Amino acid sequence: MTPEHLPTEQYEAQLAEKVARLQSMMAPFSGLVPEVFRSPVSHYRMRAEFRLWHDGDDLYHIMFDQQTKSRIRVDTFPAASQLINTLMKAMIAGVRDNHALRHKLFQIDYLTTLSNQAVVSLLYHKKLDEEWREAATALRDALRAQGLNVHLIGRATKTKIELDQDYIDERLPVAGKEIIYRQVENSFTQPNAAMNIQMLEWALEVTKDSKGDLLELYCGNGNFSLALTRNFNRVLATEIAKPSVAAAQYNIAANHIDNVQIIRMAAEEFTQAMNGVREFNRLQGIDLKRYQCETIFVDPPRSGLDSETEKMVQAYPRILYISCNPETLCKNLETLSQTHTVSRLALFDQFPYTHHMECGVLLTAR
């Protein structure tokens, strides 16, 4: 695979290899055959970052080969959304001959939605002044005149200039309902929107007969929390990143949801609060004992669950675990399988044509 070519004819073979690999990794814990969720074979990534290369009068996007570190020119990027590909051409055309926009520009980040909105961030090794703002405003207006719903942001050391806003609102159809998700520039969002819909619908399906409340750790912008509210009486969710918490609060209001409570704290801190080890001012007014959480949802970073959180989640009858790293999932399962069994297993092909696997397991108490 190269940035400008996807081996789409190999899609089924690479997916079958992942299924076999996941099944082999999970064999010590489960004999289940993974439920498999396919990605679109192209134009599946909703965000992308590129370095910019200045070559005389020419200017173009580049990526670096992960093995050789050699520079690769990228004029089209079929892994990314059609809108990103359109914007890549438009941005180069708009910046190449404009000194204020081009000078010291070293990176462009693109964030798009299925609803065809975009935020484009231009990163500089220079101070951004009024001349830059005027040039960027003219470029934004020219892009909008082409029918592109785009917002531009300029970034430099200790500087961020938003011409309008630093977010876009995604609208995802999830199991018959549209959910609005505010996505903030430079914050984590699910990169493969089509796969995200399938992940949300799978999580809904495996928790459809749930009782009581849901506790979610690492909730981000509320991606899973908002979808899962319909299966639970209440949802209590934790997140540490301020922009994600703000986006989650907006999403709760935008979707008219009244049974989700977001707490800004790390999973490790929440574990201490639940165990009565420490008291936190952020929990004033929230009676944790009121919640009857019989299901816990975790979507941890690549490092997986720490040992204290492992112990904490074992107290719940059902654990729904979305993993972006099956190796750390299996490490966690060495502990979790002492008290729980794997009752559902899914593979989500979030990043086709790569080694990367995303998977989901539902664990039920023995």
UniProtKB/Swiss-Prot annotation:
Extract the Pfam families matched here.
tRNA_U5-meth_tr
Q: Where is the active site?
A: 324 (nucleophile), 358 (proton acceptor)
Pull one GO CC term from this UniProt entry: cytosol
Calcium: is it a keyword of this entry? no
Listed under catalytic activity are: uridine(54) in tRNA + S-adenosyl-L-methionine = 5-methyluridine(54) in tRNA + S-adenosyl-L-homocysteine + H(+); uridine(341) in tmRNA + S-adenosyl-L-methionine = 5-methyluridine(341) in tmRNA + S-adenosyl-L-homocysteine + H(+)
Instruction: Reply yes or no: does the keyword Signal apply.
Output: no
Which residues take part in binding S-adenosyl-L-methionine?
190, 218, 223, 239, 299
UniProt-recorded Gene Ontology molecular function terms = rRNA binding; tRNA (uracil(54)-C5)-methyltransferase activity, S-adenosyl methionine-dependent; tRNA binding
Which InterPro entries does the UniProt entry name for this protein?
MeTrfase_TrmA_AS, MeTrfase_TrmA_CS, SAM-dependent_MTases_sf, TrmA_MeTrfase, U5_MeTrfase_fam
One GO process term, biological-process aspect? tRNA methylation
The UniProt keyword set, sorted, is: Methyltransferase, S-adenosyl-L-methionine, Transferase, tRNA processing
- The EC code for this enzyme is 2.1.1.-, 2.1.1.35
Function noted in UniProt: Dual-specificity methyltransferase that catalyzes the formation of 5-methyluridine at position 54 (m5U54) in all tRNAs, and that of position 341 (m5U341) in tmRNA (transfer-mRNA).
Protein family: Belongs to the class I-like SAM-binding methyltransferase superfamily. RNA M5U methyltransferase family. TrmA subfamily.
Protein name per UniProt: tRNA/tmRNA (uracil-C(5))-methyltransferase
Q: Which organism is it from?
A: Salmonella paratyphi C (strain RKS4594)
Q: Which gene encodes it?
A: trmA
